Amino acid sequence: MIGCCLVMASLAVTNMPPPYYGVYAQAVGAPLEKQIEFLSMPLRENVRGNSTYVNTRRYLLGPDNPNFLMTPDGSGLGQGGRIDASALEVQARTTENAAEAARCRALAAWLGKPGASSRRTDTLSPRAALHARAVEAIAAARTMPHPRVFATAADFAALKTRAEKDALLKAGVDRAIVAADDWLGKPTATYGLDGYRLLGVARQGMRRIVLAAFAYRMTGARKYATDALAEMKALCAFPDWNPRHTIDQGELALAVATGYDWTYDALSAADRETIAASLEKHALRADIPFAGWTRLQNNWVQVVAAGLTATTVALADRDRELCANHLAAIAECLPEAESVCGPDGVYTEGPGYWNYGMSFNVICLDVMKKAFGHDFGLSDVKGFKETGLYPALMTGPSGSWFNYSDSHGSTGSSSAVWWYARRLAMTEAVTEGEVAAFKEICAGKAKEIPRTLPFILFWVGEDLTRRTGTLPREWIGQGEMPIAVVSSDRSDRNAPYLAIKGGSPSYNHGHADAGSFVLDMHGLRWAFDLGAENYGKVEAAIGGSGLWSPEPDSKRWSVFRLGTQGHNTLMIGGKGQDPRGFATLTRDGDAVVADLTSVYPQARKVSRRVSVGRLDAQVVDTIEAAPGTEVRWAMNTDATIEWERKPLLHPNMYLFLSKRFSRIGVSDATGGGVWSEGSAQPENDWEQPNPGMRQLIYTAKVPESGRLVLTVTFSTWNAIKFPSGYLRREEPSR
């Protein structure tokens, strides 16, 4: 991510004498080639939250470093620094990051032939060219009247007209106005941290401001502008927007910038100045330019990008250079977060964080296109378009997500899927569950009104509920967190659906869950991922470094929901998975095979093969390890486990899982082991309970041959339970 950090270095100059110790001393005293290597190291190769690492990068990119590459305005080499272009060529050849390689080659070409020394030139560097384009964009935004953040007055007028003819849209608009009414007269926000987060306050502030500002634009009633102003002034009076937790700043920046812009004509000159000055202080001139988000590839980048982009558009007529610097930074950093979805669209942090990060991402792009006429090519980044179908692929017939990593099982409504359907004509992205969830919001039945609802309304429409495409029966998404889905028929709600996870536990928000799966049959979820933990409670119990460290000895892996023991995968030799490993997924005919060997160093080879038929699903594990090694197979379920066998009726079934009026059979695991029922509850009271959950467990030992094969088949054949008995169905076929 060298290019990303170079951008941020050009935003400001700080005097930071280097503390010569540890990684800092090693980096600043190293040859230039090593400095470049250090700057381009991805986050996962360093300790997350390491302030020494962050400060080192700041110094290497700052004017105190003789190799400082860019001047603050991005126009060329600064401080008389010299850099060997051959070092950039080496970095371009060795890095696995295609975007980084392209930047290195471009800069090397600008410097001259490989091996030549640095030279000054009037030719713009790639970074300076991007900065020049940002200056032009801000200049264009300055000419636009308010409102200009995300939508103009003409856009609001068009939305009113469209709502008159679109029942779904009208229901959404009406609900947004009712929600704005509910906020009237309530106390405004107060500063208060939850642990080290201000996020709860930020989100409620965004919800109130954006709903009120939207209601003002749609009705013209000044009571809504007055309410938005009261909340904005309360937030602007905060001592800070909590730069320690950067997404707090990002959400607050988007909220206040949108509210300021959409209610601009109702604000007094004094109120305009108060809000604009606070936005400049808390967003544009705060710690954001040097915060750790610039070196990340996750939802933080997307949230901060949306907030800062909205702020630069809202304040374009104040400080053009300051706004352009931020805009150029976003245009270079955001592709790093988008590209993680490549090549096939998988979001590494799971569908819950996709919903969060991508919603802010697409808001950011629409803000850019409305104000500048383009989005700096951000919508063309490889993986960005492909990820539009990701939530639909992760949604089983039960309506629940494959909620790996820190995701919750409930899908709810997603802003971004409506954007993909509207902007990129991906109507298959809008599932029946998404439409139902949006209608629940409109009917006032949802637990909470989405704070992004006013933005969604510019995309939603009845025309998008008529899906024109179909989802694939089998799909493998490769990349940094491989995911696969196998189903016999995505159009049949009763058909088996199985999704499995590969990748590494060490990724941001990752769990030790390689090989873990979820299973839907009869339109119900039978095998569950327990989902996310409560960050605040866990941090209070084991510390932030304990929760967020990905190291093998981290306390993170002892938390039930995060460690191997709480997932639908294997424990081998009494041990969980090594977070330094990486599980791959490959296709084998209609099946998918997960190579789990690198996450289980206690075994020679481990693989899991999953497949589905029309009426059944199968999981086959092959473990090669020392004879006598114990293997524990586990699956979280909320079903009742029925141990009574009826060999004549069900010759291939060893036990049954039942709930409601449904029942599925489970075969013996063919490994010479023992089935049992275990607890799915954590040992500590500071961990989230898992009500109604239990674990179906199979324990076996590796035989003398050193090779254990466990085959578990789930079947709906002759196993559906009705009050009057069993309904016999046709034989399964593969």
Show the residue positions of the predicted features.
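Mature N-terminal, pre-catalytic/accessory segment of carbohydrate-active enzymes
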Residues: 13-70, 74-88, 94-166
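Terminal accessory carbohydrate-recognition/targeting modules of carbohydrate-active enzymes
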Residues: 31, 490-553, 559-564, 684-685, ...
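Acidic/polar, glycine-enriched structural segments that form the non-catalytic walls/loops
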Residues: 120-178, 184-193, 217, 240, ...
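Aromatic-lined, polymer-binding surfaces characteristic
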Residues: 146-163, 169-400, 407-408
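Carbohydrate-active enzyme catalytic cores, enriched for enzymes
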Residues: 315, 353-526, 586-595, 698, ...
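Aromatic-residue-lined binding/catalytic grooves and analogous aromatic/hydrophobic interfacial grooves
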Residues: 344-347, 456, 652-655
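CBM-like, beta-strand-rich accessory domains located in the C-terminal region of large
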Residues: 439-442, 537-734
